[in-house]
């Protein structure tokens, strides 16, 4: 693959990856406006975030087998058109419950891009390069919180929150065109791949039984669940508790995301010297320290706005190390069932994300405690999973 082709491929994969983060981050600054317009509370509106996570979690079980059976592009196109239509309908939502339902449908379509992009990385690039490519794609996850909330707040002020979803629909159309013209099919259709329920469950079973998969998929998902808790809780924490403006909230969100961007690029440099297996535990320890400090600080009241931002910056920067490395290690054992492996990994991540964001919403009490408590628990749980999972990997290796 030439450098130009590699750059173009990663660029288009990055655009596909952007669907999820933009769908989440862009409408966060509009929570208060949406709540006022639909005559409900910010907490009720935040359930549309949980429904989005649930839709992504369930949808990935559909697209994983389809990507292995029909190739990567056809199921991807189908999902993006569902996403486009649902985005347009979200713009017309007349109630919070309608928005929650439509966000679920939007996620069912958009998750095709998340599953396909991971599977295509496994198809196109060598196992050794996967972590580096995932680090580059993680740039999108880092950049989107800088661009999306700022754009979302601007659109909300100038045009109204409905137009956020119009822009998301237009973005989906642009991505469809980019895939059609700029991304070759990475895996041809496999007529022998069965879509019968028994065969699908058997393939998923083969994936989930692999110790390397469940160790790093669940470790990465638990760590990422802390990020989703932050996403769900940060509007209330900054807008209502610290009383910052929507514009200031967008700037804070962008500042914290900047740490994630720097970390992803530092991870690429570290991979020249260290293995992914060596980087992950160090990052998780740092994330746990930041999470516990946030919780204790919010419980005792000894940290203010500046301290909260600094600790959030530390916590979320660790995602730049854990996500690309855990993704690469989870996908490494699979070539034939890359679609199913990608679906399972994404479903685990989004399921835990739905749980963590849901817990923050349900236990919302006007303080930062629900968000910080969930974030701290996620970091600690990820360390526990990694410890016991690595023992299972060593046990399997000793059997052979």
State each model region's role.
Residues 58-97:
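Conserved MFS/SLC helix-loop-helix module at the cytosolic interface between two early adjacent transmembrane helices
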Residues 82-89, 97-105, 306-312:
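Paired small-residue
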Residues 98, 135-181:
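Helix-loop-helix hairpin linking two adjacent transmembrane segments in secondary transporters
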Residues 102-143:
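Cytoplasmic helix-loop-helix junction between adjacent transmembrane helices
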